[in-house]
Amino acid sequence: MEAITVMELKTLLDSAPDEIALVDVRNPAEAEVASIEGSHLVPLASLESGEAIDRVRGLAEGRRLLVHCKLGGRSARAVELLSQQGIAATNVTGGIDAWSQHVDPAIPRY
C-alpha cells in the first residue's frame, strides 16, 4: 500500500494543490471537531456500502487521491476498498492526529 507522511502531504498541498484530492474518511462529528482545509468528507461507511465510490472516482479524476482519517487505520481500509474498485489511492500515515502534532498545532487533537 502506498503511503505518505503528513509532512509530505503538507508539501503537496503547498506546491500543487490542484493535482491532489484529499479525502477524509472519518465520521461527520469528527470532521466538525478538526479538519484539514480542502479535504472532502467521505465517511468510510459510505465507501464500504458502495454509495460513495463514484463520488471518489470523480474526485480522483486527473488527480492523485490521498486518504486520511484520525490515525491511519480507517484510511488504510479505505485505500484497500478503493483499490478493489480500480481506484488508486495513497494512505496518509498518522492521519489528522499527526497533522495537528507536526504541521498545524491549531488543529485540535481529540
Regions found by a protein language model. Name each.
Residues M1-A21, V25-R64, G73-Y110:
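Rhodanese-like catalytic fold shared by cysteine-dependent sulfurtransferases
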Residues V67-H68:
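Short, surface-exposed ligand- or partner-binding patches at beta-edge/loop junctions that are enriched
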